[in-house]
From Swiss-Prot:
Gene name of this polypeptide: psd
Annotated organism of origin: Bacillus anthracis
Record function comment: Catalyzes the formation of phosphatidylethanolamine (PtdEtn) from phosphatidylserine (PtdSer).
PTM comment text: Is synthesized initially as an inactive proenzyme. Formation of the active enzyme involves a self-maturation process in which the active site pyruvoyl group is generated from an internal serine residue via an autocatalytic post-translational modification. Two non-identical subunits are generated from the proenzyme in this reaction, and the pyruvate is formed at the N-terminus of the alpha chain, which is derived from the carboxyl end of the proenzyme.
GO terms under cellular component: plasma membrane
UniProt protein name: Phosphatidylserine decarboxylase proenzyme
Length: 262
């Protein structure tokens, strides 16, 4: 019953008009009125911001803010996979040979997430990692490794929330929400970076479309809190053992080791 009611409420409020109205407001000068309250409620670390709080003219500018130079360091070890974002480490685990994985009691299909069987087959037997970004986090997304971009594509339309309620009651939000996917070939091994849109402000902006990416390089940004899913081929990585669900991660922090580079 709760799941049915939750989904009904989302469907009634999560339309194009609502998304458009909220997006236009966030991009308007009028939204600057609530910036101080937003920063206080979500406890934004103003010491790290590139500009002072009063210099952001709209909520959109604050959402997509940059950090001061030197506030994040990228692990330079050739064997490391780094966190592509600031966020909360949600979960990791094996991708079954059936091209599915379980998180928070819900089964997700890699075929659904990536749009077809051929793409999904590449990750059968591999590893997934999920990182959640709250409204307080830095919203720019960086590459977790270096390599050649093999494909960029967008799937989905509407988005369910990716918070705890959305993960429990939503329609498989990680594989059904609006999402932007970048696949990278790194030394012959593949990784998919799935950028999952958030409810209402359903926007993910790519910053470039170059054929290669470098570890730590800026790739895109969310316009509100959301989630990143990383998919790795079989026998490609070993997740850092110390990582725990609920742990805060910072951009550039080592989260896994490349097995071929050990």
């Amino acid at each position: 019953m709760r799941r049915t009611l939750y989904r009904l409420m989302i469907e009634l409020t999560n339309g194009r008009f609502t998304s458009y109205t909220l997006r236009k407001f966030a991009q308007s000068r009028l939204s600057s009125i609530i910036i101080p309250s937003y920063a206080k409620v979500f406890q934004i670390n103003q010491d790290e911001m590139e500009k002072g709080l009063k210099e952001y003219r709209t909520l959109h500018e604050l959402f997509t803010r940059k950090l001061k130079e030197g506030k994040r360091s990228i692990d330079t070890d050739a064997s490391s996979i780094v966190s592509p974002v600031d966020g909360v480490f949600a979960d990791h685990g094996p991708i079954e040979d059936t091209k599915t994985f379980d998180i928070k009691g819900k089964r997700y299909s890699i075929v659904d997430m990536l749009g077809n069987e051929e793409r999904a087959q590449r990750y059968a037997g591999g590893t997934y990692m999920v990182i959640y970004l709250s409204p307080s986090h830095y919203h720019r997304i960086h590459s977790p490794l270096s390599g050649s971009v093999t494909e960029r594509f967008v799937l989905g339309r509407k988005s369910y929330p990716v918070n705890a309620a959305g993960m429990e009651y939503g329609k498989e939000p990680l594989s059904k929400n609006y999402r932007s996917v970048t696949e990278v070939n790194s030394d012959g091994e593949h990784m998919a970076l799935v950028k999952v849109g958030a409810m209402f402000v359903n926007s993910i902006e790519l910053l470039h479309e170059r054929d290669t990416v470098q570890k730590g390089e800026e790739m895109a940004y969310f316009t509100f809190g959301s989630t990143v899913v990383l998919l790795f081929e079989k026998d490609m990585i070993e997740v850092v053992q110390e990582l725990k669900s609920g742990q805060e991660l910072r951009l550039g922090e080592k989260i896994a080791t490349r097995l071929a580079h050990k």
